[in-house]
Design a protein with these regions (language model features):
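Acidic, mature catalytic/reactive cores of soluble proteins
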Residues: 1-607
């Protein structure tokens, strides 16, 4: 049986990440990149699909864990009848090779420990050839991959696994270092695990020290910022949506997607979260990734790209993995990369506008690229698309897609007004009026008193909560207040927000999914804009309670099973948490910042 997602903690080196369960098993690790094949895939199968267990032999051991200070170094404390020990798990910031370090330290008495290492390359399908090198290093090779393990513990082979049993006493420190490298090269050089620990903690402490986050929810926001940093692919600045694939949105269902890619839709809210927290280097790197990935013909702009901007993200299914909680299929790649989703044009142009407002300089070529996007958008904004939820049914005229088309032209006008850029402002103003009138005429249902998911539909959609946030209409407008009331009435489940009604059968998939956590943060943001601060704070604190013991959130939450579902941890959820906390803190307000971008009273930053 699969372990609850709540049982997992994240470690990473800003190029890939691993999930460590409460019982001391690393059940998911893709090497050397987030989107590489997994060498530990027990998360989506069984222990025989790859894992690394390091745990007390005593099944009654009491386990507690935490991240050491403000870092991504995980410390698990083990208490038995005979003693106590801690296991320290981390991945040093990437050097020449990729390492996972595990250090067992004796705290009191003695603790008997077991380790079981099952390496299975290519998502659990390939058993490697394992041998011992003259210096005692264990080496596993299959195809292009090599993994070496170094430890003073005497390892031995048993039934295609590597196992050991040892005792740690008070004052002992027993390290394990596992390193990945290409199989055609010599075994990677060893590292000093204690020095690596000091350097890793220093890396995270120095990074957190740059933060401007203060106030009541600073701890939660800082943990979410650390999670975003861990999900950033450092060589390019791209931010993966999650380090996992195919964790189901509905237990036992088919809504299982690969999220190890970078979505343009996350652009604006991510930039605001990073800039407001003081992380301009990361914001600049994300902006630069955005420009590189989207470069080329505007008609070929995709909704998502690979870590380095790769465009071919071909989707296929792997049959040998039974799936998390037997939820199949297990998918690699994501076919949504080829969908038409018109909202991404507005997201890209809004993100670049917010970067400008934040003082991040852009070149003439960057502006030319944005103008080319706008010229293309003029000819396609009325086309039906798959919408922001990437439905796999027939394309439709989604209301939010049209709203974001308006945002694209609106932000272009503001860029000209605020920064002296050149452009056909009169034509763009006419486009804004045309799109605004079109949305208000066809995207609003007078009988419902609410905006609707798509033109002519009676369905609601949580994306409509973003209409005041992007400045399309003020939160005081009766149509916005009616939309919020309708969503409260029809999309709330146990106080949390569904994306839309999957039972309607319009998205091309069987019904059923959890509540989408980012949508509940959007409702809290709408409450802030409507001056419903008490409602916003209560909802926000309810969402904080959903986090697991180390502060992580998945994509969704199953209110019936009372457990997280969907890919984990989810960047979108953590970005939404950061921005809502900042909105509530009243110091830096991403919702008001973004809405204010639509109006002329915004002032440019001092460079």
């Amino acid at each position: 049986m699969s372990k609850p997602l709540e049982s997992y903690a994240l470690i990473g080196d800003c190029e890939t990440a691993a999930l460590v369960s409460h019982d001391g098993s690393i059940d998911w690790l893709c090497w050397p990149r987030f989107d590489s094949g997994a060498c530990f895939a027990a998360l989506l199968g069984t222990r025989l699909h790859g894992r690394w267990l390091l745990a007390a032999r005593d099944p009654e051991a009491r386990i507690t864990r935490r991240y050491r200070s403000k870092s991504l170094v995980l410390e698990t404390r083990i208490e038995t009848r005979d003693g106590a020990a801690v296991v320290i798990d981390f991945m040093p910031p990437r050097g020449k090779n990729a390492d996972v370090v595990r250090i067992v330290r004796g705290v009191r008495g003695h603790v008997e420990m077991d380790t079981e290492l099952i390496l299975r390359f290519d998502y659990g399908s390939t058993v490697p050839w394992v041998n011992r090198l003259p210096d005692g290093t264990f080496r596993a090779i299959a195809g292009p991959d090599m993994v070496v393990v170094r430890t003073p513990v005497e390892l031995r082979g048993k039934d295609l696994t590597t196992v050991a049993r040892f005792v740690v006493k008070k004052g002992d420190s027993v390290p394990f270092v596992m390193t990945h490298g290409p199989s055609h090269r010599a075994a990677p050089k060893t590292i000093d695990p204690e020095e690596a620990l000091r350097e890793t903690e220093a890396f995270w402490h120095d990074w957190v020290a740059q933060s401007r986050v203060r106030g009541k929810w600073a701890g939660a926001v800082t943990r979410s910022l650390i999670t975003l940093k861990a999900l950033t692919y450092a060589p390019t600045g791209g931010l993966v949506a999650a380090p996992t694939t195919s964790l189901p949105e509905h237990l036992g269902g088919v809504r299982n997607w690969d999220y190890r890619f970078c979505w343009l839709r996350d652009a604006t809210i991510t930039l605001l979260a990073l800039m407001n927290a003081g992380y301009y280097d990361e914001a600049r790197a994300w902006r630069n990734w955005l420009l590189r990935a989207g470069a080329g013909s505007p008609s070929q702009l995709q909704i998502m790209y690979g870590l380095a901007g790769e465009r071919r993200l071909t989707e296929y299914e792997i049959e040998w993995l039974p799936g998390y909680e037997r939820s199949r299929p297990v998918r690699i790649g994501n076919a949504a990369h080829g969908q038409l989703q018109l909202d991404v044009y507005g997201e890209v142009i809004d993100a670049l506008h917010q970067a400008r407002r934040g003082g991040i300089k852009q070149s003439r070529e960057d502006w030319d690229f944005q103008r080319a996007l706008l010229t293309h958008l003029e000819s396609v904004w009325q086309q039906p698309d798959q919408g922001m939820w990437e439905v796999r049914g027939e394309p439709r005229p989604f209301t939010y897609s049209r709203v974001m088309a308006w945002v694209a032209f609106n932000r272009a006008i503001r860029s000209v007004e605020l920064f002296g850029l050149d452009g056909p402002v009169a034509r763009w103003r006419a486009m804004c009026r045309k799109i605004h009138d079109d949305v208000c005429a066809h995207g609003f249902d007078r009988k419902l008193g609410s905006f609707v998911q798509s033109y002519g539909s009676k369905q609601l959609d949580a994306s409509l909560l973003l209409i005041p946030t992007v400045g399309f209409l003020p939160a005081t407008d009766p149509r916005i207040q009616g939309t919020v009331r309708a969503i409260e009435k029809r999309l709330l489940v146990d106080g949390l927000v569904r994306r839309y009604d999957t039972h309607s059968g319009h998205d091309g998939l069987p019904d059923g999914e959890g509540v989408f956590l980012a949508c509940s943060f959007w409702l809290a943001d709408a409450y802030v804009l409507m001056n419903r601060y008490g409602d916003a704070q209560r909802l926000f604190e309810r969402l904080l309670d959903i986090r697991n013991d180390v502060g992580l959130l998945a994509e969704e939450y199953d209110t019936h099973a009372q457990r997280m579902v969907g890919n984990f941890p989810q960047a979108f959820s953590h970005v939404a948490l950061i921005n809502t906390a900042q909105n509530l803190a009243r110091a830096a307000k991403p919702a008001r910042q973004r809405a204010a971008s639509a109006y002329q009273n915004a002032t440019p930053p001092v460079d």
